[in-house]
Amino acid sequence: MNWKYIFIIISFSLKAQAEKENNYISKGNGLHENKSYVDAEAEFRKALSINQDNPIANQNLGNTLYRSEDYDQANQRFFRSQKDNLDKSQKHLAFHNMGNVFMKKKDYPKAVEAYKNALRNNPKDDETRYNYALAKEMLEKEKKEDKNK
């Protein structure tokens, strides 16, 4: 009989934690949309303090950090998001965003790889296909410039 009560208490506790986590993510999303990136970051970090493996919170925190031009931290969050996520559409998003970070940093070999991984998870995304082609073009241009030096 005691096990039954313990199970019920644990179930309610876990449900409350999940709701709290989702509330932080939801609030962070609203703040991000309003371009309140510092406040959005705080909300996503609160969600991650409850569950550090939440791929949505990691992805959204990465987006917020990207908008704040903190590309290294953003990339870490995108990497974590794709690592913790089994959903192909979310993996696609994470790899696509990692490619965007690498493009900003002019790290074209890594951008090409990231976009390639994004396309493996969603081969129909035209934007990713375009970015992949652009990254390959920039990589070739960089190689030619290095050769001419």
Predicted features by range, described:
Residues 65-149:
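Feature detects intrinsically disordered, low-complexity acidic/polar segments
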Residues 1-5, 107:
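Positively charged n-region of N-terminal signal peptides that target proteins for export
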Residues 19-43:
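Alpha-helical segment of the N-proximal tetratricopeptide repeat
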Residues 7-16:
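Hydrophobic h-region of N-terminal signal peptides that target proteins for export
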Residues 39-82:
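N-terminal, post-signal-peptide region of Sec/Tat-exported proteins
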Residues 1-2, 16-19:
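Absolute protein N-terminus
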